Amino acid sequence: MNELVYGLSALGISLNSVQLGQFETYYQELVDYNSRINLTAITEYKDVQIKHFLDSVSLVLAGIKGDEKLLDVGSGAGFPGLPLKILFPAIQLGLLEATQKKARFLSEITVKLGLSGVEIISQRAEDTAQNPLYRQKYSLVTSRAVADMATLAELTLPFCAVGGRVIAPKKGDIEEEMDRAATAVKKMGGRVFKVIKVELPGLEDGRKLVLLEKISNTPALYPRRAGIPAKTPLI
């Protein structure tokens, strides 16, 4: 895990032997499972360390507390939620993943990593956000899902408690995308707090973290029915 260790050193973070072992296990299980179902196109050891593990942990630049109640929306193979859980074991983590095969991987890898305080939720975000067990219950919501910011705002902010935050990693020039998302962010009860540049070893490709803050309750009609936020963003 030399690439990951080096990248984390730029953040002033060091891993203990247990955490290093967990990341090694995560890599091995990811590659093994990926041979059976498509979890990721990134499988080389160095690339996984940088583009999955370090990229996930880079969210600490936006300010993450060790006792967050965190929901990772569209978690896929567990990024960024599981690397953050390894780094901060006291986090109460929810992994929201609608695809059953990916959710099964998340359940299995959580056990193999010896993690507690992790809930796998295999449902659509639009449906889950209307469930009072999950609606406005999280201090932090993350999503690395490839989606327009207007769509992401509708799929993430309803999970945030007032005073909570959304961290959404993005790449490239996002000024126009953020302008389009302004209506959705406001309607969900949020505001754009800041955009943070990510400059870490191996991640010098224009990565940014969009930080949204929840300032008021999300109206009951949001999010809209499954599929609509992606097909018809609120712009």
UniProtKB/Swiss-Prot annotation:
S-adenosyl-L-methionine binds at residues 74, 79, 97-99, 125-126, 144. GO terms for molecular function: rRNA (guanine-N7-)-methyltransferase activity. It comes from the Bacteria. InterPro entries: rRNA_ssu_MeTfrase_G (IPR003682), SAM-dependent_MTases_sf (IPR029063). Its EC number is 2.1.1.-. One of its GO terms (cellular component) is cytosol. Its main location: cytoplasm. It is found in: Cytoplasm. Pfam families: GidB (PF02527). Keywords: Cytoplasm, Methyltransferase, rRNA processing, S-adenosyl-L-methionine, Transferase. Belongs to the methyltransferase superfamily. RNA methyltransferase RsmG family. Specifically methylates the N7 position of a guanine in 16S rRNA. This is Ribosomal RNA small subunit methyltransferase G.
